[in-house]
Amino acid sequence: MRKTITVIAVLIVLALIGVGIVQYVNTSDDSDFIGQPGEPTGTETTEPPVQPDWCPAVEVIAAPGTWESAANDDPINPTANPLSFMLSITQPLQERYSADDVKVWTLPYTAQFRNINSQNEMSYDDSRNEGTAKMNEELINTHNECPATEFIIVGFSQGAVIAGDVAAQIGSEQGVIPADSVRGVALIADGRREPGVGQFPGTFVDGIGAEVTLQPLNLLVQPIVPGATMRGGRAGGFGVLNDRVQDICAPNDAICDAPVNVGNALDRALAMVSANGVHALYATNPDVFPGTTTNAWVVDWATNLIDNG
């Protein structure tokens, strides 16, 4: 029994710590993109919303992963973690576009999770809830001031969970902005990933998110990661945004490519230890998108959405 709990602990720490401390790699690729915005799904309007001239045409909202942000970080020029993976996406976009045309806003949130190795940190639930509230606040503020501005949302690891949750609310018409205001969403290493939900560019993986795999063990894992609720998948998926959500996962990433059932999870927990480094290598891993890297692909995908809407 002690050995089993130890293995579970290894899996949980693996599946939740996921620190994206990666080296910036600035590459590009002419890959085709799937799930671009198509015909409007709702009632068409005859006149576009009127907004001030200073409003950007597009706002990119980026949600960093665990330990890659801070609650008091600067959302326009974040410095909380200079090695944050999201910087390898946001900085090229800021260099490519004028801030008058494209606003790039990085989510400032605590980005922690309490576990057996860091009892003094904010719990995963509290960190995630804080990030979700701040992202929704930014969406509301921009949409109220600039109703014609459209959004591209990108998240990594814990940030992907936040971005995915917000996208699911918007897609089910329960969000803070209308779905027609969202051009696209990219989730990198989403802990709530499920097959058939969203689009899956790049290399196919048949695993699921760690929160989905570990949902049956939620009560058992609380002593190991107190305040980290394993919520499973997102009921209803991404709704009308399904074709606009890119769910990106590296093979053998324990966060998003976990075993489908708990029994296999226990058997494979030790094997996942050696694969844990995969989660920190999206900026250099050639196995996610052949011929390019994840950050370069996302930059090109976002550029295509900005230029071609």
Curated annotation (Swiss-Prot):
Superkingdom of this protein's organism: Bacteria
Subcellular location: Cell membrane
N-terminal signal peptide: none
Molecular function terms from GO: carboxylic ester hydrolase activity
Chief place where the protein resides: membrane
Disulfide cysteine pairs (residue numbers): 55-146, 249-256
GO cellular component terms, A-Z: plasma membrane
InterPro entries found in the cross-reference section: AB_hydrolase_fold (IPR029058), Cutinase/axe (IPR000675)
Family named by the database record: Belongs to the cutinase family.
Function: Esterase that may be involved in cell wall biosynthesis and/or maintenance. Hydrolyzes pNP-butyrate (C4).
Protein name from the UniProt record: Carboxylesterase Culp6 homolog
Organism: Corynebacterium glutamicum (strain ATCC 13032 / DSM 20300 / JCM 1318 / BCRC 11384 / CCUG 27702 / LMG 3730 / NBRC 12168 / NCIMB 10025 / NRRL B-2784 / 534)
